[in-house]
């Protein structure tokens, strides 16, 4: 889906549901 979640994951985790960490940003399908 949207490639960018508007969240960063420099610490390695994403808080947004459905998002995964593709350092240093969160992405989703």
UniProtKB/Swiss-Prot annotation:
Which GO terms are recorded in the biological process aspect for this UniProt protein? defense response
Please verify whether the record's keywords include Disulfide bond.
yes
- Crosslink Cyclopeptide (Gly-Asn): position given as 1-29
Signal sequence residues: none
Q: Which InterPro entries match?
A: Cyclotide (IPR005535), Cyclotide_moebius_CS (IPR012324), Cyclotide_sf (IPR036146)
KW GTP-binding (keyword) present: no
Q: Which domain of life is it from?
A: Eukaryota
Q: Which residues cross the membrane?
A: none
What kind of modification does the protein receive after translation?
A: This is a cyclic peptide.
Q: Which UniProt keywords apply?
A: Disulfide bond, Knottin, Plant defense
Which cysteines in this chain are paired by disulphide bridges?
5-19, 9-21, 14-26
What does the record say about tissue specificity?
Expressed in roots and runners but not in leaves, petals and petioles (at protein level).
UniProt remark on domains: The presence of a 'disulfide through disulfide knot' structurally defines this protein as a knottin.
What is the role of this chain? Probably participates in a plant defense mechanism.
Tell me its family.
Belongs to the cyclotide family. Moebius subfamily.
* Protein's recorded name: Cycloviolacin-O22
Task: Give the originating organism.
Answer: Viola odorata
From the broadest rank down, the organism's phylogenetic lineage runs:
Eukaryota, Viridiplantae, Streptophyta, Embryophyta, Tracheophyta
């Amino acid at each position: 889906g949207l490639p960018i979640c508007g969240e960063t994951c420099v610490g390695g985790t994403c808080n947004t549901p459905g998002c995964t960490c593709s350092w240093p940003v969160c992405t989703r399908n």
